């Protein structure tokens, strides 16, 4: 007889060969990395064509992800075979979160999302600015069980703590596990960084018997090793994921759904626009004159190029050191100051500091030293391992850098230890976690007019008065087959939050386009798709268009 035990995973015994094959087929998915390599005509040797989301243990039992439960039950029904099932969940300690703060009355879509998660665990999708954290707090208030809230950054950890203290009047002392702290609080709500749990598995063992609810914030990160090694170990009866961008660039969102549960609710973005919950920005493309040779014969025209490929990194290096491009951007940042507080988003920490230096000089020349600027980033690494196409290149680069190279058997590729910053840059630009927190707080309090930021700002940065955004480095958006522009969606979301102090807030987003370089031009086209998907009116493409800053401001859009 078939036997099924539901816990942090699903254990199945007594199955037939046909049943096993059916389940295995369900949980074997095409490997996006393999498909990407084939698209780019890159070597696929050593890359698995498929990924297995199931395994068998030493006793022969099938071990399946807990998010597969609904589909497994359908399989059992379809086969019409007798079975017995059991659960090994932790209901968790019953707790009283006190009264809900009525200053945070939920809108209809928020109530519907919470109700959907109460009915069944799984993933809920809601755009940035829709109140995901508030909805999460309402959910745990309704559940009344000891809760673990998982985040992937310390900044989100503290923002979540502030929301909990504002909404849950009886939450008591909130536990914090991260940022060097190991405080369990009163045990009602514990907010933890996955990095801390990953490094301290004993904490997971200590929490497992008492935690009945697990919230995975920014759940699209679940496929990362940190989440798989932490969240997937909890036996909590209720696990839910919250995210604004479920689709991942690497195509591994299936891991999220299988690890947490099916998609249970999607908040419609159109309704948020209708009720003023999101501000629709004006998008303006600013065309640069930057030109360079393609990154390489292989990757030059590939929209997927990037990451740790040495050719692409070299191309980006040329871009950020192009003085004419930097000057154009800096001038536009200064010209846009009257439109409101701004965030300047770059993939490169170095570019943030370079642009800030130019902007500060322009402001000083115009007698506008009262305009305050700051740079915030997620941290610096002096060196990083980068991919080389072959051994000869790796050896040559390592000699040039005065570092080392290696062959990674698991990845089947050569890597070079590549300097990211000079010693002076590293010492001048690095900031502590405390300093980063202080900068973000100053920006939140309106003490900073122009904030230069790296990937830190993609998620969770909650500064409602930001009304101007500058996307200053090329990045990929949505492709023809997938919604892979999650990073861009997160970034533009920073200026789409309504400002309670400015009900008439208008927002403008500057996208700097380097259309003389093939790969950057293709990335520009994919970004247009993201804007359209978000319901934003996009200016028409003009083959010969070269918008200048002066032309734009003469149009008097505002």
Report residues per predicted region.
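Conserved pre-motif I regulatory segment
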Residues: 52-54, 75-78, 84-125
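Walker A/P-loop
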Residues: 119-143, 452
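Conserved helicase ATPase core of P-loop NTP-dependent helicases/translocases
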Residues: 158, 173-185, 199-202, 343, ...
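Post-DEXD/H (motif II) to motif III coupling segment of the RecA-like Helicase ATP-binding lobe
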Residues: 212, 220-284, 531
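A conserved SF2-helicase RecA2
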Residues: 258-280, 291-295, 483-489, 497-558
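Conserved RecA-like P-loop NTPase helicase motor core
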Residues: 380-386, 419-533
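Conserved helix-turn-beta segment of the N-terminal RecA-like "Helicase ATP-binding" lobe
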Residues: 155-180, 361-368
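Conserved strand-helix element at the start of the C-terminal RecA-like helicase core
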Residues: 146-157, 316-359, 531
């Amino acid at each position: 007889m078939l036997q099924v035990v539901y816990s942090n995973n699903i254990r199945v015994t007594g199955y037939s060969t046909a049943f096993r094959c059916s389940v295995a087929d369900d949980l074997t998915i095409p490997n996006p990395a393999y498909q990407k390599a084939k698209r780019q005509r890159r070597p696929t040797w050593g890359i698995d064509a498929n990924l297995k989301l199931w395994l068998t243990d030493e006793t022969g039992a099938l071990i399946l992800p807990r998010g597969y439960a609904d589909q497994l039950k359908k399989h059992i029904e379809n086969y019409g075979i007798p079975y017995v099932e059991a659960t090994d969940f932790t209901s968790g300690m019953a707790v009283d979160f006190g009264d809900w703060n009525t200053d945070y009355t939920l809108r209809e879509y928020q109530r519907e999302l919470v109700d959907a998660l109460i009915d069944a665990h799984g993933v809920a999708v809601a755009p940035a600015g829709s109140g995901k954290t508030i909805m999460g707090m309402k959910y745990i208030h309704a559940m009344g069980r000891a809760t673990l809230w998982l985040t992937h950054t310390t900044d989100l950890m503290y923002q979540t703590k502030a929301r909990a203290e504002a909404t849950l009047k009886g939450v008591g002392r909130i536990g914090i596990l991260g940022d060097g702290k190991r405080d369990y609080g009163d045990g009602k709500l514990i907010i933890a960084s996955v990095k801390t749990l990953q490094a301290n598995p004993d904490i997971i063992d200590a929490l497992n018997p008492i935690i009945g609810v697990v919230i995975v914030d920014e759940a699209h990160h679940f496929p990362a090793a940190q989440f798989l090694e932490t969240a997937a170990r909890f036996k909590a009866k209720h696990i839910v994921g919250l995210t604004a961008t479920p689709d991942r660039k690497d195509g591994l969102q299936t891991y999220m759904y299988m690890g947490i549960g099916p998609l249970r609710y999607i908040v419609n973005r159109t309704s948020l626009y209708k009720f003023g919950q999101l501000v629709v920005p004006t998008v303006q493309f600013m065309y640069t004159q930057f030109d360079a040779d393609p990154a390489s014969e292989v990757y030059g025209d590939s929209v997927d190029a990037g990451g740790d490929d040495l050719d692409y990194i070299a191309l980006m290096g040329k871009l950020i050191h192009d003085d004419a491009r930097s000057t154009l951007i800096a001038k536009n940042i200064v010209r846009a100051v009257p439109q409101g507080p701004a965030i300047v988003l770059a993939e490169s920490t170095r570019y943030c500091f370079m642009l800030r230096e130019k902007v500060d000089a322009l402001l000083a020349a115009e007698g506008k030293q009262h305009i305050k600027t700051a740079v915030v980033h997620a941290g610096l690494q002096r060196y990083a391992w980068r991919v080389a196409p072959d051994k000869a290149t790796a050896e040559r680069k390592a000699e040039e850098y005065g570092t080392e190279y290696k062959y990674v058997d698991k990845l089947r590729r050569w890597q070079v230890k590549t300097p990211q910053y000079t010693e002076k840059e590293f010492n001048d630009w690095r900031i502590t976690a405390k300093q980063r927190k202080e900068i973000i707080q100053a920006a939140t309090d309106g003490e900073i007019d122009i904030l230069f930021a790296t990937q830190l700002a993609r998620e969770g940065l909650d500064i409602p008065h930001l009304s101007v955004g500058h996307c200053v480095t090329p990045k990929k958006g949505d492709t023809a087959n997938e919604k892979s522009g999650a990073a861009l969606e997160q970034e533009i979301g920073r200026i789409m939050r309504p400002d309670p102090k400015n009900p008439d807030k208008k927002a403008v987003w500057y996208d700097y386009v380097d259309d003389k370089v093939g790969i950057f031009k293709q990335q520009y086209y994919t970004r247009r798709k993201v804007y359209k998907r978000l319901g934003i009116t996009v200016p028409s493409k003009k083959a010969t268009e070269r918008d200048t800053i002066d032309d734009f401001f003469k149009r008097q859009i505002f």
